[in-house]
Amino acid sequence: MEEAEELLLEGKKALQLAREPRLGLDLGWNPSGEGCTQGLKDVPPEPTRDILALKSLPRGLALGPSLAKEQRLGVWCVGDPLQPGLLWGPLEEESASKEKGEGVKPRQEENLSLGPWGDVCACEQSSGWTSLVQRGRLESEGNVAPVRISERLHLQVYQLVLPGSELLLWPQPSSEGPSLTQPGLDKEAAVAVVTEVESAVQQEVASPGEDAAEPCIDPGSQSPSGIQAENMVSPGLKFPTQDRISKDSQPLGPLLQDGDVDEECPAQAQMPPELQSNSATQQDPDGSGASFSSSARGTQPHGYLAKKLHSPSDQCPPRAKTPEPGAQQSGFPTLSRSPPGPAGSSPKQGRRYRCGECGKAFLQLCHLKKHAFVHTGHKPFLCTECGKSYSSEESFKAHMLGHRGVRPFPCPQCDKAYGTQRDLKEHQVVHSGARPFACDQCGKAFARRPSLRLHRKTHQVPAAPAPCPCPVCGRPLANQGSLRNHMRLHTGEKPFLCPHCGRAFRQRGNLRGHLRLHTGERPYRCPHCADAFPQLPELRRHLISHTGEAHLCPVCGKALRDPHTLRAHERLHSGERPFPCPQCGRAYTLATKLRRHLKSHLEDKPYRCPTCGMGYTLPQSLRRHQLSHRPEAPCSPPSVPSAASEPTVVLLQAEPQLLDTHREEEVSPARDVVEVTISESQEKCFVVPEEPDAAPSLVLIHKDMGLGAWAEVVEVEMGT
């Protein structure tokens, strides 16, 4: 009986243990039987698939009712149009991750066996927002397709998706030919890239005195170098690590031996004949060279890797096989390296990689690949916040820092900052006033290289009438933009207004130069002294004072400091006044004088005289007027005619003494005083009636000193 009860208790304990969750090594289970070293913690409930999709949804996409499947959510484009070639991923395959955690073989091989529809099923079963992308009902409705790159699932746009359209899954059409995203080439291309990167890293870590015949180190044992080499590959395409490649394929083994490529290398053996023939070197004029096959179009090895490949200090340069005559050339570009020269010689610095579209040459092949995106329009770097895409990784990183408000390259001379070192260098040319980029045909210099490239296109145009003549004056213009700016001269339109003073300008560049007068910014500094100027023409005129350059007038020989002042000076000799006033017709030689004159026609005259109240538009005009109110200093008396010829009139001041007389002796007033009233009708003249017995001397005395009117009461005294 007791034995039965013990068996019953042991059965209950076994049942209870079976219901409890199994503990693994990650939860602190001790295999020696001592128990758990760490207890279980409360795990919060996992979020639903819709919540995960909302959290991982890129910018420019939104969730909404699907038109392909009723009562289901779909992914809609609500931002900028999605261009073909846009790539999202790698996707997190939910089923594969669960099976991998349980120790079961993943179902990627099963999906691959099902063909392209297996990838569609895997995309629908992913754990991100791509699980809500519905299938299209017809092939014509599909615009996105699942693709695999190095056995990792991605989602790619293969048709233009306009705003307001739903993203619908459909396998990528096979008529587009082999591409990087198809499963047939991604594995071999990834193996080729890892082989290339590993060999370059092995050459880098090898010592200079190492024998070339010694096999290179196994890449599996150099994990830090392998990680560094993997990071050198462009982030546009993420390839698996060396461990994953070694699991899916045979061990790579030594790649270089006795200076030749190992013919038994598994990576080379796995490559198809097209890739093997394309990995051959383009021979240099001296007959030697080496190359490594790049993964595919768009894979950009780092500049540091290309520099190592071109370095003459490499001690184990591989020699590639000669391509077979009948081998088919594929679209994979090659990385070629100059042969190592003698000791002490510098590497070749020629720009050997030339663009077939525009003829621009580059030092490194990776730079040529980046430049090719300009012509193809391929922009693999997509901003998930605003939806803008870039073809350059440097510009993309600077754009992402701009969302955070970070500009890591400030200008040391002003308060501006930039996101890239290239933009900062172009800006610093503005402070120096230099124009380092000169046209080799006409000699015109520019401060920026893009401006020079645009200028060179004007020389490529044949000598023919300009396609954009002005309909008003017939002047030929280069393009429509120049014509629009020119038409503002005829229409008088000035669309660019200054927010500080309200002054209008025809061109935006003139407004920017004018705003510096308000902000006090002086970016143009003189290289000879400490002066700075807000506009570049002012700096050029100032530089003449240091160089001693002068412009002589051909008429009078006067030296002027700039051509603008010389032209204005020549108008003084010719009598030309090309700036007339539209209101009164008065003309001037300079536009600045005309603008100053136009202010006199304004009704508002803020500068008024405190004495007489007369108004003026300019302060200098008011100061000139106030000089007329100042009392004149006493001066020498003018000569007077003889008293015998005509009577003499003398004005008396406030002092009792007389200031001027017609004789040397003092004149005394007579007893007879005649009062005369002078009116305006007599034209500022008065007549004193003559008496036959009166003396010829008369004295005029003002009754009230200081009056300016002519209607005054004066006293005329008869001298005895």
Swiss-Prot record:
One of its GO terms (molecular function) is identical protein binding. The modification Phosphothreonine is found at residue 322. Residues 275-285 have a biased composition (Polar residues). A zinc finger (C2H2-type) spans 353-375, 381-403, 409-431, 437-459, 468-490, 496-518, 524-546, 551-573, 579-601, 607-629. InterPro entries: PRDM17_PR-SET (IPR044412), SET_dom (IPR001214), SET_dom_sf (IPR046341), Zinc_finger (IPR050331), Znf_C2H2_sf (IPR036236), Znf_C2H2_type (IPR013087). It is found in: Nucleus. Pfam families: PRDM2_PR (PF21549), zf-C2H2 (PF00096). One of its GO terms (cellular component) is nucleus. Residues 287-296 have a biased composition (Low complexity). Highest expression is observed in adult retina; abundantly expressed in the fetal eye. In the retina, it is detected in the outer nuclear layer, especially cone and rod photoreceptor cells, ganglion cell layer and both outer and inner plexiform layers (at protein level). Expressed in retinal blood vessels (at protein level). Keywords: Disease variant, DNA-binding, Metal-binding, Nucleus, Phosphoprotein, Repeat, Retinitis pigmentosa, Transcription, Transcription regulation, Zinc, Zinc-finger. Residues 201-350 are annotated as: Disordered. PROSITE patterns: ZINC_FINGER_C2H2_1 (PS00028), ZINC_FINGER_C2H2_2 (PS50157). One of its GO terms (biological process) is regulation of transcription by RNA polymerase II. May be involved in transcriptional regulation. It is linked to Vitreoretinopathy, exudative 6: A form of exudative vitreoretinopathy, a disorder of the retinal vasculature characterized by an abrupt cessation of growth of peripheral capillaries, leading to an avascular peripheral retina. This may lead to compensatory retinal neovascularization, which is thought to be induced by hypoxia from the initial avascular insult. New vessels are prone to leakage and rupture causing exudates and bleeding, followed by scarring, retinal detachment and blindness. Clinical features can be highly variable, even within the same family. Retinitis pigmentosa 72: A retinal dystrophy belonging to the group of pigmentary retinopathies. Retinitis pigmentosa is characterized by retinal pigment deposits visible on fundus examination and primary loss of rod photoreceptor cells followed by secondary loss of cone photoreceptors. Patients typically have night vision blindness and loss of midperipheral visual field. As their condition progresses, they lose their far peripheral visual field and eventually central vision as well. This is Zinc finger protein 408.
